[in-house]
Amino acid sequence: MAALFLKRLTLQTVKSENSCIRCFGKHILQKTAPAQLSPIASAPRLSFLIHAKAFSTAEDTQNEGKKTKKNKTAFSNVGRKISQRVIHLFDEKGNDLGNMHRANVIRLMDERDLRLVQRNTSTEPAEYQLMTGLQILQERQRLREMEKANPKTGPTLRKELILSSNIGQHDLDTKTKQIQQWIKKKHLVQITIKKGKNVDVSENEMEEIFHQILQTMPGIATFSSRPQAVQGGKALMCVLRAFSKNEEKAYKETQETQERDTLNKDHGNDKESNVLHQ
């Protein structure tokens, strides 16, 4: 009996220990769970801060871009928004008024009914000028005319064309029209003429094709590089380019001179014939 009692007591003790372990283990997990989740919970806050900073940076970049565009705007009326405390001022006649506080500048603008325009912001202090509305309008028109007179030219493109020495006249006319379009767009045109198969043709005959093409564009195009042998003498190559403005002007003057000489010569011949008839 005693042995049976001890056995039951031992089993009951083991069950109690297991129950306590489960109970305390569950309690420990409940306590430690929030501590484990706290770094995860703080993550959104960190993400939010980073996002806010990134958004602010992008906004600053956009503002800087807007400021740069405003600074690049040609000849604009500043108005009363003078960023510098002291500026170097010129009046509407171009007279140097020296350094002046912006409050005095605004007062002068009101007294004379003038506008304020930036002249040079890279100096210290920055240079500004008082101008009338009409002066600003005239200056803008002058700047636009200067831009039209000196347009910004992009990089020169090179077009390439390969012809055969035995090309037909119809095909040559078609290719010549294409070359003329490229020349009008100020492109360089590289032309290569290869010797046709089973055709005995001299370099002079091939070079004559280049001159035939060039003669269709008098006063418009000329050789950038003259015809020369390439590919071991199997082909000739040249580069055509458009006339420069000075070349166009010189060509027109030459043509006008020749026309005047021709008219004078014809007029002189008419006089001689009239004298003979008399």
UniProtKB/Swiss-Prot annotation:
Residues annotated as transit peptide in the record: 1-31
GO cellular component: mitochondrion
Cellular location(s): Mitochondrion
Major location (coarse): mitochondrion
Residue ranges of the region described as Disordered: 249-278
Keyword Mitochondrion tagged: yes
Protein known as: Translation initiation factor IF-3, mitochondrial
This protein's encoding gene: MTIF3
